[in-house]
Amino acid sequence: LDATQLHGIATNLDYLRQIVATEAFHSGTVWTRFLDSFTPAAPVIEVLQPGTFSSIQDYPGRLGYWDIGVPPSGPMDDFAFRLANRIVGNDESAAGLEFTLQGPTLRFHTDATVALTGADCAATLDGEPISNWQPLTVKAGQTLALGRAQQGCRGYLAVRNGFDVPEYLGSRSTFSLGQFGGHAGRTLRVADMLPISRPALAACTTPPPVSAPQALDAALIPHYGTEWRIGVLYGPHGAPDFFTQAAIDEFFASDWQVHYNSNRLGVRLVGPKPSWTRANGGEAGLHPSNVHDCEYAIGAINFTGDFPVILTHDGPSLGGFVCPVTIAKAELWKVGQVKPGDRIRFHPISADDALAREKAQQQVIATLRPHHAPTFAVPSLAETASGSATILAAIDATATTPQAVYRQAGDKYVLIEYGDNVLDLALRLRVHLLMMALSERAVPGVEELSPGVRSLQVRYDSRIISQSDLMSLLLGLEATLGDVSTLKVPSRVVWMPMAFEDSATLGAVARYQETVRACAPWLPNNVDFIQRINGLTQREQVRDTLFNA
């Protein structure tokens, strides 16, 4: 029984484990009335009230599947989450609970040591107020109630040993949109029973605690206000390629308000409309924000038309809109605490500055003591002789090779673009060649490769390989790729079912029209728009073209 794993709907597995562990069972003195006096102590936490969008998450989340569109998920405020695990002494990979604006009410069926971090939700234990940021002993039968967030947006609960939920694609994090991970692949509901891991069991996959519980130094407790300063790196798309320099300057000079239509997929911002250097996106679309493809970095600020959205932990991996800046990894936790109505001022930082901040944050988590990063000069946003300040390097086209542009996409990503902004299979083959060459090298610090049509995103760990060393590697590999005009690669034909104008698609268009943009050339019906711009006489021709391709 100790080696048995059963997940999902609650079972009597632990009940049986406790029965076979009794002296009566071992001595063979069990009789028909034995269970009348047997009181089990289930290692679970019962959900009396689920709170708002409460879910199981772990750090760093579900990495390695960005190329097939699976997001990392994980805690929106990973700083508070990791500190919660550190306070109770857990291994960093232990699963914890995230809740948004309104916390849950939980009944403990076993003794436990817990820690609350993040937004202060006026927590009480059996009606008595308790404090965040320190270990707390909870006895079996007690009720922990979390109210509405006083400051900030998201709170976190860590329990010593972590929550016992199965790993899916290498993570216990909930991706509710995909309906997998966490507890039953969804947010919490009334009467859910959340099992606590027991590392002593052979079936347990959660590592045991690594230290004794320890309170956080008061100087380290973050301040959650309504005005935020967030450090970003310029790029991948800037001036003068896409935006005017005036638009970039205005972006950094403005206070951006957090829109109510924000969640774990993205945080919508309200602010000034940008000015563009292009009239449209060419082949990619009617709006100048359109590009054929862009692999998105977590923390990228994505302009869907004239409207910016911070792409977060459950967001899309690939799209067709430009991103002028990307939030530094050590600053991204702040996005998890902004709430509707808050204001954000972004400020540019360098890759070296971002790395120093990340190292300082890591030291704080490791030691639970203050650690300050050195200061760095503010990087220039002005256009250079080689073009936009977002461009790390560029290689001119030749008779047999396309232009290659290497764009900074935060402190953890480089975006490589080939050729012009057109749909060309030869460019996709070159992306494939580069991806294979990088994979074969297996360079330490190069962690993930995500291809698009004419682009490749490289995710790297700047603590292992610097941006400059990565660029040297990429430029060196580019010189070895050569001409792809005669390249042959293994291929196959995949037949996929597809619904035309499905109700879910029509519903998405309706929501877009209601919440994002009321009037646009492609509204109110996308098929009518495609028919019109392609000069077709009947809308059925759109369907026929699609299915006959």
Report each predicted region and the residues it spans.
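Conserved "landmark" site that anchors the functional core of diverse proteins
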Residues: 41-549
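Catalytic cores of soluble metabolic enzymes centered on carboxylation/carboxyl-transfer
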Residues: 1-43
